[in-house]
């Protein structure tokens, strides 16, 4: 007669948390990111983000991707989300927001580098169907201001880039 080992009790003791291995494992949903930014912008105690909506963040991330100079993530993510650089080092809600933002960055980068004609800015649409481009342009301009000197040659009226930036209203703001 063979003896069988006693079965281990099923329970939470000894249970392992799922291992997070990719940025997507850490990221909050894009919809949750919008709520998080809105809550943060209204908070009287937290550092306010420069991007207060998904549309504004989308414009900002697009400027980072399409801009004339590369920027380290800490340079643009921290001010846009209103977080400290230390947030990159912890498994917190702030890091989940950072991860979601970087995933959006990668998606925009992929689209603009492989299928630019399919890029669709995330504009705000009112209940009556009106499209409001202002938040997106404000986000784009927020990043331009971070590196205004680098952008300045693109804003010269003699360049094709000037003509491309003009419809967004970014040129008139400067």
List each language-model region with its residue ranges.
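Domain-length accessory/inserted modules outside core catalytic folds
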Residues: 1-174
């Amino acid at each position: 007669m063979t003896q069988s080992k006693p079965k281990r009790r099923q329970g939470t003791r000894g249970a392992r948390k799922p291992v997070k291995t990719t940025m997507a494992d850490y990221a909050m949903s894009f919809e949750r990111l919008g709520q998080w930014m809105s809550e943060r912008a209204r908070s009287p105690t937290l550092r306010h983000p420069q991007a207060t909506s998904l549309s504004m963040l989308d414009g900002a991330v697009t400027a980072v991707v399409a801009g004339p100079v590369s920027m380290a993530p800490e340079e643009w993510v921290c001010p846009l989300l209103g977080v400290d650089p230390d947030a990159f080092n912890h498994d917190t809600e702030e890091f989940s927001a950072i991860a979601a933002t970087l995933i959006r960055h990668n998606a925009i980068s992929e689209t603009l580098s492989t299928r630019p004609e399919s890029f669709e800015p995330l504009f705000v649409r009112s209940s009556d169907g009106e499209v409001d481009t202002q938040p997106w342009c404000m986000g784009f301009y927020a990043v331009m201001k971070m590196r205004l000197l680098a952008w300045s040659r693109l804003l010269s009226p003699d360049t094709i880039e000037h003509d491309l930036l003009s419809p967004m209203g970014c040129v008139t703001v400067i």
